[in-house]
């Protein structure tokens, strides 16, 4: 039996549940009799163990099961009768005061309910829509990047099929150098401060700028000693903020040869006949696909920000806590896949709270927008989205099979389509401002949502 619902806070509720002990005892005895049929004990045949022994061994466990079942059933019935949408799981505790009637046990179930979501006027929402032009200059830049990805090196000063690298035999930006080095702090070598035959490309930023500067201008066989100040935020905590002295010896210099933009280069990019114009058109299509994806992500973020701004709701803490746990687990799995020892890393929940609160808030808002405007994902939309994914792979049919053979994978696509439906709906109602953005800005790493 459950009492009326008490309101403790905006979303917090409490129900008091009373369970007659006679009902509990009757159910316990019933379950123990069923269990006794299969209980084994030394000196007794299966199913012939005395009930007293069965009760001694299993009574406490069965009583807990019965109480959990009865309290859970009473809670669910009370929530249903009062039309309550419970957010998360209730906290159920025995009531400690003396209000319980004789022959009963009383529990308090404290929980949160889903909030009322008040959607504002979409016509008053401001949404920014990014626009980007893919020009010939962007195609040229991409070709340069593709050339650098296919770079190969030749020893400077030695004749090769592509020349000897010129008369300047000193190390300069773009060269790959091989060195021995040793570093000391106050005359003492430190961990990670010594290496032999260490190769890196000057100008790529793999090494600290002062280290690269100490290498530039040297010839093979030359050595140099110079001071190097480690930044205070350097990843090596033992040397961060300290000044070391490095001695380097240059052992080899290799100059970079970039492939010519010719038919062979085009073939290496998947153009069978090596036609350079086809290559440029293919690059443009790929760039436009990537630009479209990033613009869509930016626009979606702008729409979500607008929805948050115009909507009013209280977010259940229980749902935030659940999402914090999900984010923590996702982070652990991601780090483990990268080979990191997760057990050595702290995961304070507060690191994820802000992100979880936004995710939960948006989820509640989106659900309300979808329900109010009938924006559910339609089967043909889901199919079209999967086919779009498949086009960027070598074997589209395998991708289609991958999604359509697993309901959970298809559900992920449905969620994306649903979000897109909401975005398109909001764009049709809100005040949309187009914002031209430079190609490089859009494609920079921190531009992707």
UniProtKB/Swiss-Prot annotation:
GO biological process: 'de novo' cotranslational protein folding; cell division; chaperone-mediated protein folding; protein transport; protein unfolding
Coiled-coil stretches noted in the UniProt entry, renumbered to this chain: none
Location(s) in or outside the cell: Cytoplasm
Official protein name in the record: Trigger factor
Catalytic activity: [protein]-peptidylproline (omega=180) = [protein]-peptidylproline (omega=0)
Gene Ontology CC: one annotated term: cytoplasm
Superkingdom of source: Bacteria
């Amino acid at each position: 039996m459950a009492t009326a619902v008490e309101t403790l806070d905006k979303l917090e509720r409490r129900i008091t549940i009373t369970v007659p002990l006679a009902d509990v005892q009757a159910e316990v005895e019933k379950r123990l009799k069923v269990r006794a049929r299969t209980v084994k004990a030394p000196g007794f045949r299966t199913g012939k163990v005395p009930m007293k022994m069965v009760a001694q061994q299993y009574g406490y466990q069965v009583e807990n099961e019965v109480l959990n079942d009865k309290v859970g059933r009473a809670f669910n019935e009370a929530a249903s009768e009062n039309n309550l949408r419970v957010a998360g799981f209730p906290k159920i505790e025995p009531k400690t005061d003396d209000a319980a009637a004789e022959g009963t046990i009383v529990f308090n179930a404290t929980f949160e309910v889903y909030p009322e979501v008040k959607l504002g006027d979409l016509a008053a929402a401001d949404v920014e829509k990014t626009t980007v032009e893919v020009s010939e200059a962007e195609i040229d830049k991409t070709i340069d990047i593709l050339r650098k990805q296919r770079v190969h090196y030749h020893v400077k000063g030695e004749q090769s099929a592509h020349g000897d690298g010129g008369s300047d035999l000193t190390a300069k930006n773009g060269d790959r150098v091989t060195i021995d080095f040793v570093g000391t702090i106050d005359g003492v070598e430190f961990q990670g401060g010594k290496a032999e035959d260490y190769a890196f490309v000057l100008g790529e930023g793999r090494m600290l700028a002062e280290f690269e500067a100490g290498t530039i201008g040297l010839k093979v066989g030359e050595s140099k000693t110079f001071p190097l100040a480690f930044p205070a935020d350097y990843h090596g905590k033992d040397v961060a903020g300290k000044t070391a002295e490095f001695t380097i010896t240059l052992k080899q210099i290799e100059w970079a040869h970039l492939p010519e933009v010719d038919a062979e280069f085009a073939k290496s990019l998947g153009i069978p006949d090596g036609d350079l114009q086809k290559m440029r058109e293919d690059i443009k299509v790929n760039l436009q696909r990537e630009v479209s994806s990033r613009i869509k992500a930016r626009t979606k973020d702008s729409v979500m920000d607008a929805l948050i701004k115009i909507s009013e709701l209280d977010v259940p803490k229980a749902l935030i806590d659940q999402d914090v746990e999900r984010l923590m687990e996702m982070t652990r799995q991601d780090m483990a896949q990268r080979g990191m020892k997760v057990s050595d890393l702290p995961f304070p929940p507060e690191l994820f709270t802000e992100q979880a609160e936004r995710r939960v808030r948006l989820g509640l808002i989106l659900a309300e927008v979808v329900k109010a405007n009938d924006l559910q994902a339609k089967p043909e939309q889901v199919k079209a989205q999967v086919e779009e994914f498949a086009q960027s792979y070598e074997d589209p049919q395998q991708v289609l099979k991958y999604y359509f053979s697993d309901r959970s994978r298809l559900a992920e696509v449905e969620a994306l389509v649903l979000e897109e439906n909401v975005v398109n709906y909001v764009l049709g109602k809100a005040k949309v401002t187009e914002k031209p953005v430079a190609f490089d800005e859009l494609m920079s790493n921190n531009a992707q949502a």
